[in-house]
């Protein structure tokens, strides 16, 4: 009995030397032993080293800011055309985050000293995007945020009203960004906010309003501070502010605002200024195609936007102007097939989950694009057309194991014809 006890005492941890009696568990393997305490210590060391390596990798990733050419190339994978807008956006976004990184690297004291010595302080450059509905404005902004891995929020300017009136306060825009950042204030302060339909908050006339314009000029005035940079008090639950409510303080200085709208009618304002509009018997009459071929938005000036209904202070806080063009039929066909996550690829993936292939004739794609042009919905309307076309097929497909592939023809799009089905070999043999 004494010998057995002695042999038990001989079993020791090969790392710390403690006997089997001194530890809770001793694990054997290949002539060596390790106790539970040493296992726990090893785990702590590994976790600490992995954590440090991960933190270093995260810091390196955070420091890596893509160049304008890389940003534009990334946008090319997802957005068709709009080359000029991509270049403007790429440079603006690059400069915005380059400014932030430089300031963070210098620190507050260094930044003050630099401002005193060099008298150069780089101001924030928010972006104004002009272009028709369905031309890719929102998608460009979303894709930028995805590349930069920053929080992104979309707000509709038409739902906003001046403080004290029924509707949303402008601070609710910031709440959406906080929610997108999981209420991480530091991360939210480097995010992107996209304000759509800003043309709908233009004031009713070019002259300053005597009466209150709570959904137009009033909203523009309310947006001024957060566009320029201020510490805003955000109610965590949204809604109106109450005196006894706790607020989250959010600095908007480094938030990039992309403000966009279709600006229907702005082309007329620009054409009057540039003298394209003739008067009298000698005036040249332009056809509809000729009018559309003139790219008026690229010639926009601040005075045109003032005449349209934006206040000068608002325009001054949006120094970068990017214009997007109407998509023609050829561009819409490319939108359907070329981007990394194009609609055709998405529906082909859905069909493959039910064991069938999906193919489109070139003529069918052109007919879909033509339909979007007729509806004046641009790229945004393509999905609705695809749904109308494919829902009846997708309804029956899960019950039809005999279908190997589906071919969409022009007749399917234009006249509601039946698609062409190719059946599996097993189905043919059984038939």
From Swiss-Prot:
Assigned keywords, A-Z: ATP-binding, Chaperone, Metal-binding, Nucleotide-binding, Zinc
Binding site residues for Zn(2+): 13, 16, 35, 38
Superkingdom of this protein's organism: Bacteria
SUPFAM superfamilies, alphabetized: Glucocorticoid receptor-like (DNA-binding domain) (SSF57716), P-loop containing nucleoside triphosphate hydrolases (SSF52540)
Protein transport listed as a keyword: no
Annotated binding of ATP, by residue: 132-139
GO BP terms in the entry: cell division; proteolysis involved in protein catabolic process
GO molecular function, one term: ATP binding
Limits of the ClpX-type ZB domain: 1-54
One GO term describing the cellular component: HslUV protease complex
Pfam assignment, any one: zf-C4_ClpX
Key word Zinc present: yes
Subunit structure as annotated in this protein's UniProt entry: Component of the ClpX-ClpP complex. Forms a hexameric ring that, in the presence of ATP, binds to fourteen ClpP subunits assembled into a disk-like structure with a central cavity, resembling the structure of eukaryotic proteasomes.
Protein role: ATP-dependent specificity component of the Clp protease. It directs the protease to specific substrates. Can perform chaperone functions in the absence of ClpP.
Similarity comment: family membership: Belongs to the ClpX chaperone family.
Entry-linked NCBIfam families: clpX (TIGR00382), PRK05342.1 (NF003745)
Protein name (database record): ATP-dependent Clp protease ATP-binding subunit ClpX
Gene that produces this protein: clpX
């Amino acid at each position: 009995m004494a010998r057995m006890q002695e042999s038990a005492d001989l079993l020791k941890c090969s790392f710390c030397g403690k006997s089997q009696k001194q530890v809770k568990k001793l694990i054997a393997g290949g002539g060596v032993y390790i106790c539970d305490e040493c296992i726990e210590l090893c785990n702590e060391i590994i976790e600490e080293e992995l954590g440090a390596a991960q933190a270093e990798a995260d810091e390196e990733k955070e420091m890596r800011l893509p160049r304008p050419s890389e940003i534009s190339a990334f946008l090319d994978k997802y957005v068709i055309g709009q080359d000029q807008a991509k270049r403007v956006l790429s440079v603006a976004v690059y400069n915005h985050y380059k400014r932030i990184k430089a300031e963070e690297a210098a620190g507050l004291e260094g930044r003050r000293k630099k401002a005193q010595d060099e008298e150069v302080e780089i101001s924030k450059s928010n972006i104004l995007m002009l272009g028709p509905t369905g031309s890719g404005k929102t998608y460009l902004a979303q894709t930028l945020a995805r590349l930069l891995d920053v929080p992104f929020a979309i707000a509709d300017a038409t739902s906003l009203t001046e403080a004290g009136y029924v509707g949303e306060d402008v601070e609710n825009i910031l709440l959406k960004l906080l929610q997108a950042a999981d209420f991480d204030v530091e991360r939210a302060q480097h995010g992107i906010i996209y304000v759509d339909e800003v043309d709908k908050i233009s004031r009713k006339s070019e002259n300053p309003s005597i009466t209150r314009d709570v959904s137009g000029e009033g909203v523009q005035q309310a947006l001024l501070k957060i566009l320029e940079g201020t510490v805003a008090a955000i109610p965590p639950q949204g809604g109106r502010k109450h005196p006894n409510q706790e607020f989250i303080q959010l600095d908007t200085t480094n938030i990039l605002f992309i403000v966009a709208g279709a600006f229907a009618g702005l082309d007329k304002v620009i054409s009057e200024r540039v003298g394209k509009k003739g008067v009298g018997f000698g005036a040249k009459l332009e056809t509809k195609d000729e009018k559309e071929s003139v790219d008026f938005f690229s010639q926009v000036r601040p005075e045109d936007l003032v005449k349209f209904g934006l206040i000068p202070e608002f325009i001054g806080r949006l120094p970068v102007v990017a214009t997007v063009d109407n998509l023609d039929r050829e561009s819409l066909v490319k939108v359907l097939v070329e981007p990394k996550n194009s609609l055709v690829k998405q529906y082909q993936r859905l069909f493959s989950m039910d064991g069938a292939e999906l193919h489109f004739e070139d003529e069918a794609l052109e007919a879909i694009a033509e339909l979007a042009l007729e509806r004046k919905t641009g790229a945004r309307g393509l999905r609705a057309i695809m749904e109308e076309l494919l829902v009846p097929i997708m309804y029956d497909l899960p019950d039809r194991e005999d279908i190997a592939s589906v071919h969409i023809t022009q007749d399917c799009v234009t006249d509601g014809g039946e698609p062409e089905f190719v059946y599996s070999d097993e189905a043919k043999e059984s038939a």
